């Protein structure tokens, strides 16, 4: 009977390693800010839309290179996903007294011309290794579109 323990433990070890590369979602709502658009803003679908703010990884005190923004409609469906670009935010580094946050800013240029009129919010997603830090902004904004 003891001879079965080793193969069983070896198999469990292999199976546990299968999840090592899976992306893990982590809530990070205290480590970001969507500074624009401000809550209650009305934006027009035919005008360039450039949301901006800052975000970092609180646990590691780092600034993940990869940032993605998701536009989420009132039905909680993701209707647009686009990469954001990191930009300098010396004000954030100063506010947190941490020079590592000097490049914690982000900005994106999104084409929202195909979106319908309605209320939306933005989720900021940072990825570092197999961890994906999700930060949902409480700022809701309205898109005015000719599509209705």
What are the roles of these predicted feature ranges?
Residues 20-49, 55-56, 147:
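Short, compositionally biased P/S/T/A/G/V-rich stretches that sit at domain boundaries
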Residues 57-65:
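A short beta-turn/strand-edge loop motif at beta-sheet boundaries
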């Amino acid at each position: 009977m003891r001879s079965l323990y080793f193969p069983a433990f070896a198999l469990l070890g292999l199976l546990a390693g299968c999840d090592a590369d899976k992306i893990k979602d982590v809530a990070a709502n205290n480590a970001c800010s969507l500074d624009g658009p401000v809550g209650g803003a009305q934006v027009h679908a035919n005008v360039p839309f450039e949301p901006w703010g800052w975000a970092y990884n609180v646990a590691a005190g780092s600034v993940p290179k990869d940032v993605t923004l998701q536009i989420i409609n009132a039905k909680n469906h993701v209707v647009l996903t686009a990469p954001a670009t990191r930009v300098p935010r010396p004000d954030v580094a100063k506010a947190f007294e941490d020079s590592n946050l000097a490049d914690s800013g982000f900005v994106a240029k999104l084409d929202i011309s195909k979106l319908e009129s309605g209320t939306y919010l933005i989720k900021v997603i940072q990825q570092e290794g197999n961890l994906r830090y999700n930060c949902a902004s409480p700022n809701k904004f309205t898109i005015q579109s000719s599509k209705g």
